[in-house]
Swiss-Prot record:
Reported cofactor(s): Mg(2+)
Binding positions (IMP): 14-17, 39-42, 130, 144, 225, 240, 304
Annotated residues for binding of Mg(2+): 14, 41
Name of the protein in its database record: Adenylosuccinate synthetase
Record keywords: Cytoplasm, GTP-binding, Ligase, Magnesium, Metal-binding, Nucleotide-binding, Purine biosynthesis
Pathway stated in the Swiss-Prot or TrEMBL entry: Purine metabolism; AMP biosynthesis via de novo pathway; AMP from IMP: step 1/2
InterPro entries to which the protein is assigned, alphabetical: Adenylosuccin_syn_GTP-bd, Adenylosuccin_syn_Lys_AS, Adenylosuccinate_synth_dom1, Adenylosuccinate_synth_dom2, Adenylosuccinate_synth_dom3, Adenylosuccinate_synthetase, P-loop_NTPase
Physiological role: Plays an important role in the de novo pathway of purine nucleotide biosynthesis. Catalyzes the first committed step in the biosynthesis of AMP from IMP.
Domain of life where this protein originates: Bacteria
Subcellular location: Cytoplasm
EC number: 6.3.4.4
Residues engaged in binding GTP: 13-19, 41-43, 306, 332-334, 414-416
UniProt-listed GO biological process terms: 'de novo' AMP biosynthetic process; IMP metabolic process
Length: 430
């Protein structure tokens, strides 16, 4: 039987999953995206060249690797086509290696309009979405109004479903938000064009995954966003609209729990968050700005500055428990170079009580005060180091503390953006 590894974010997203997925795809059968949409931004740096992927799995830069988009992903036709064409312009063969589940829902133009209208109307209470229609597309999926890739094969039924969806969404857009509605014929014609484009890539992703496992091939499941943004387990309502946990990998790709051999949780050596929502260890000072500048902490999808703070072990332990994380990968260690001292949040003060567990609601998180352990920093550069022994003693001590406090072994340490800037302590496929 083959080996399957799930790579997912153990914080609020932007942990560096794309680089690690690319790193682990050297000898692999397939990479599958199982949730989210083009709100993800996975940045890869190979031989100094930067590539940002939003929808296509990060394994696409490896020749011969099959890339799958599962039923749990919501697909923007325009974004998919743009990303394919940009990659093909670099000389890569894309469409023959990209397979898309017919059950994947489509992000329609009215989803984007609704997303943006809501954020504008919310004003200061806005969640901070990317405004790309992700949430409304998932709403239609649950409300059984969604249009899926499979529907494109049946023009008459597509027209009927599109009319029904537009009746609903145009009513909301015009009557509730006071913005223009959408034209049926234009959207329908665009969908017919996209139907021809996507048809050769349409395939039974779940079936492919089962066959690969029987053939003894390695499969990597690539998560987007992070555990603390999960629709069920995150800081609701400041969350994404999909399941970002290992449970989402199972349902979003169509495999069983027995098909997963290893869960790799990715976490930065500090913490970041984009948009609104609680963030107990946030550093709204020159220390936080310094981390942002050194770490180039600006969203790959939106360009928005990320909020930066100290490592939060309470939150990390929650992610480890929810996902059954087998091993951790700590990224961006080099961003902490040159800092006199570092802090790790080990507990919260909440209503005059100390707790090592995270509250179950966003308001509770907002009312938490972090309890810190302090560690000495290091002046030496860790950038590009590939050996544990060559790390400064203080950096090793910091990582060992993270490992012990989180109750989960560290298998990989990333010391820079390039594929080679990595310390591999334990290969998840070994």
């Amino acid at each position: 039987m083959g080996q399957s590894v799930v790579v997912l974010g153990a914080q609020w997203g932007d942990e560096g999953k794309g680089k690690i997925v690319d790193l682990l795809t050297e000898e692999i059968g397939a990479v599958v995206r199982f949730q989210g949409g083009h709100n993800a931004g996975h940045t890869l740096v190979i031989n100094g060249k930067k590539t940002v992927l939003h929808l296509i799995p990060s394994g696409i830069l490896r020749n011969g690797v099959l890339c799958l988009i599962g039923n749990g992903v919501v697909i923007s036709p325009a974004a998919l086509r743009k990303e394919i064409e940009e990659l093909e312009d670099t000389g890569l063969e894309i469409r023959s290696r990209l397979k898309i589940s017919p059950a994947a829902p489509l992000i329609m133009e009215y989803h984007i309009a609704l997303d943006q209208a809501r954020e504008k109307a919310a004003g200061g209470r806005a969640i901070g979405t990317t405004g790309r229609g992700i949430g409304p597309a998932y709403e239609d999926k649950v409300g059984r109004r969604g249009i899926r890739v499979a529907d494109l094969h049946y023009p008459d039924q597509l027209a009927e479903k599109l009319r029904d969806a537009l009746d609903y969404h145009n009513f909301v857009l015009t009557r509730y938000f006071g913005v223009d509605g959408m034209d049926f014929q234009r959207i329908y014609d665009e969908m017919l064009v996209f139907a021809e484009y996507v048809e050769p890539m349409k395939s039974d992703v779940a079936g492919i995954l089962h066959d690969l496992r029987k053939q003894g091939k390695r499969v990597l499941f690539e998560g987007a966003q992070g555990t603390l943004l999960d629709i069920d387990h995150g800081t609701y309502p400041y969350v994404t609209s999909s399941s970002t946990t290992v449970g989402g990998a199972l349902s979003g790709a169509g495999v069983g729990v027995q098909d997963i051999d290893y869960v790799l949780g990715i976490a930065k050596a500090y913490a970041t968050r984009v948009g609104g929502g609680p963030f107990p260890t946030e550093l709204d000072d020159e220390i936080g700005q310094g981390i942002r500048d050194r770490g180039v902490e600006y969203g790959a999808s939106t360009g928005r500055p990320r909020r930066c703070g100290w490592m939060d072990i309470v939150a990390l332990k929650r992610a480890v428990a929810i996902n059954g994380i087998t091993g951790l990968c700590i990224t961006k260690l080099d961003v902490l170079d040159g800092m006199d001292k570092l802090k790790i949040c080990i507990a919260y003060e909440y209503h005059d009580k100390r707790s090592e567990y995270a509250p179950l609601d966003a308001q509770g998180w907002e009312e938490c005060t972090p309890v810190y352990l302090e560690f000495p920093g290091w002046n030496e550069s860790t950038h590009g180091i590939t050996s544990w022994e060559k790390l400064p003693p203080a950096a090793r001590a910091y990582l060992c503390a993270l490992e012990e406090l989180a109750g989960c072994p560290i298998g990989i340490v990333s010391t820079g953006p390039d594929r080679e800037h990595t310390i591999m302590l334990h290969d998840p496929f070994a």
